[in-house]
Amino acid sequence: MYGNDNWINSYLDAILDAGKGAAASASASAVGGGGGAGDRPSLLLRERGHFSPARYFVEEVITGYDETDLYKTWLRANAMRSPQEKNTRLENMTWRIWNLARKKKELEKEEANRLLKRRLETERPRVETTSDMSEDLFEGEKGEDAGDPSVAYGDSTTGNTPRISSVDKLYIVLISLHGLVRGENMELGRDSDTGGQVKYVVELAKALSSCPGVYRVDLFTRQILAPNFDRSYGEPVEPLASTSFKNFKQERGENSGAYIIRIPFGPKDKYLAKEHLWPFIQEFVDGALSHIVKMSRAIGEEISCGHPAWPAVIHGHYASAGVAAALLSGALNVPMVFTGHFLGKDKLEELLKQGRQTREQINMTYKIMCRIEAEELALDASEIVIASTRQEIEEQWNLYDGFEVILARKLRARVKRGANCYGRYMPRMVIIPPGVEFGHMIHDFDMDGEEDGPSPASEDPSIWSEIMRFFTNPRKPMILAVARPYPEKNITTLVKAFGECRPLRELANLTLIMGNREAISKMHNMSAAVLTSVLTLIDEYDLYGQVAYPKRHKHSEVPDIYRLAVRTKGAFVNVPYFEQFGVTLIEAAMHGLPVIATKNGAPVEIHQVLDNGLLVDPHDQHAIADALYKLLSEKQLWSKCRENGLKNIHQFSWPEHCKNYLSRISTLGPRHPAFASNEDRIKAPIKGRKHVTVIAVDSVSKEDLIRIVRNSIEAARKENLSGSTGFVLSTSLTIGEIHSLLMSAGMLPTDFDAFICNSGSDLYYPSCTGDTPSNSRVTFALDRSYQSHIEYHWGGEGLRKYLVKWASSVVERRGRIEKQVIFEDPEHSSTYCLAFKVVNPNHLPPLKELQKLMRIQSLRCHALYNHGATRLSVIPIHASRSKALRYLSVRWGIELQNVVVLVGETGDSDYEELFGGLHKTVILKGEFNTSANRIHSVRRYPLQDVVALDSPNIIGIEGYGTDDMRSALKQLDIRAQ
């Protein structure tokens, strides 16, 4: 056997040649617009001329494995010195791969069963929900729903949709936290976080600020002061040059226009990837909140006679910015809009299907559970969710607990006719394709594709020579791909399609614009692996002189690269496994360049509008090669695709995008801080405090809580802070329980400036009825503005009825006897807090299961366990102790940097929310803390994924004595002013 290893080598060669997920079809046909192959056989099969059993084996069995990994294994095997040892290693490797493939099929079967089970679990309560409402549907409503997309998602542009006029002066807030964001010379492709989204949000900000009726646009991102990054990323404010739209003119003021606002959060000397931003988002929110409040008042002075001009919308881009937008929306009571860009559940399913990592490993790498929960929270808080395609809504968002197409359709229909939705709500899904900037459009050809004579004085752009130097024959049509070097972009399949098809190689050149790079050895592992694989394939197929892969290009040179492809009558190719937006396809069409695009995602709907190319299966390299050959070899087809693209591209312009965008937000009801109109109705001493101490300790007895309060007040007095320091009690207790607690301790309500009760659903201030405070003369004043602030989509009675029904189903089973363990607790309930008593905490369902159930039912609320898991509280989605503190900050002008929050070692299920932000946090450690209970052992993700416990703003002290408190104040540099 060792003397004849040809069979082994044939399998190894096949492994190297087989593409990821290669189809075993005999002919490769492109999809859409003529397809590409027609009835003729594949060029690759004609060229091959014979059937290879080894290749068939690999293409049928070895799917889903990265060729780079297999190639590295083959290199290691060939490095063996002894021929006998080498052959043995080769043989073992081949059979090991076969065994892995069999295991992978078993895993795929298990995964399919898991997905089926999850789908059934999700559909059951949704079926119950729709059946509950179906009895109230008008006759014929179901038929109306089925065919009308506007009923399904609320995305119709027809009817009496109000428009933004030049009289309106809107303030719009955009948020995009990750990557390197600046207005000029964008470093797109420098890393995995600096890509199309960065370009999109910057251009959106510029375009919106140029629209009539829009006064100011702020694009918030992270301030980056890390070494090796340009100083521009550390500038707090960067003005953006507005896009010039024809006939769009309006009067401007000092604070008008578009700006990038950079907020410092997280480690100041480090650049953080998006997966590591989660613990610092609340810190960003606090910084952004301060800026928005100041800017709203400044704009108000210019345009509103002194009344604050609060944001019309706060628009989050990507999951992390979705959380930030939700928190800011809740703090300011203004509408939220969300764009997901690339959704976490879709990525998770894709990674699980590959079978290389477990769910735990995926979460460790990508923090995927934080991302998915953030997207669910964005669904809870958003008025509008913007998608680029219908496929994104029906196939991606439909995976989430908080959205379901059929239920959304029914709820939209009920809202239209004013019917009762029983407290249920779903955000409006609207489809607005991305826009492109037409400012750099230069056509060197007429509509028939004939070259216009260039000006004698004009010079070719320098990037052209940088690309042309790679080619032996630069006059051939140029196939252009613009994509970052990541596995999902599928660049290696494109290179293999080009390399294996000799007629295509003879016809055209290939140009790969894969971002900017220095040395491959210094790149991110995934990017380096893709680039190494590309270079290996170029060498394997001997593509020297036929493939260009420049190391650097400027963002401003990208239009020139498109023009070069048009000049050579080439084509643009974009074949990732899935394309969320497809901005590069629109840019190519804008320059008159026909396209070959993936059939998965946004390109399908872009193609329906533009009809300027062919769609292909990104897994099928034969189809890619055939489509490219067809497009480049048939002159009439090329000219028709070019003409169609130029004729229809106006539908993807920024003016069109902004017109649709502004028409959507004009339908949103006006929401703004309720206290703006009745600022003086409550006289609260907290308004004049220099420092505020918030006591939010849940893990101690009532006796220890009283001692902590007393010692905190005494510590402030001894540090000469008593007159300038206010105290806030933040707890899950009701106001009645708080009053009883203070009475038993001999304390006065006036010892505090405010009381955050019922886990943040109620806010009270002490109110004196006489000149001398006493227990008999002190009452509590309810902040009704706060109630208006948090009532957004509160389910009310409909939510209560559903929770009562759910509570009756939670039982403890002892043999044949079932005993209910959760009961409604009217005594501890209030208007915005539904309380339930827990008889046996050991039988509590995990909180994430209850939250999942509420979302499936479209009941938007915040559920939490408190009192050592003996009480369940369900409150509005924008209510919490943390959010109540931000409300106090905005209403009474409290600087969060001067706030100290006291917490225990454990607490209620909202414990993690009390850490993050600009305020200081003191953890009281010691045996007086109750042990952690079950509510913290079933988290969606580890605490350290969302809390930066090593932050300088968080300290721990042993004990809670007066001296301990004073030591903490000194450590935090809290001093008398």
From Swiss-Prot:
Catalysed transformations (reactions): beta-D-fructose 6-phosphate + UDP-alpha-D-glucose = sucrose 6(F)-phosphate + UDP + H(+)
Example of a GO MF term: sucrose-phosphate synthase activity
Segments of this protein annotated with the region Disordered: 124-159
Regulation: Activity is regulated by phosphorylation and moderated by concentration of metabolites and light.
Source taxon at top rank: Eukaryota
Classification via CDD domains: HAD_SPS
InterPro entries: Glyco_trans_1, SPP-like_dom, SPS, SPS_C, SPS_pln, Sucrose_synth_GT-B1
Subunit structure: Homodimer or homotetramer.
Summary of the function given for this chain in its UniProt record: Plays a role in photosynthetic sucrose synthesis by catalyzing the rate-limiting step of sucrose biosynthesis from UDP-glucose and fructose- 6-phosphate. Involved in the regulation of carbon partitioning in the leaves of plants. May regulate the synthesis of sucrose and therefore play a major role as a limiting factor in the export of photoassimilates out of the leaf. Plays a role for sucrose availability that is essential for plant growth and fiber elongation.
Protein name (Swiss-Prot/TrEMBL): Probable sucrose-phosphate synthase 3
Organism: Oryza sativa subsp. japonica (Rice)
Organism placement in taxonomy: Eukaryota, Viridiplantae, Streptophyta, Embryophyta, Tracheophyta
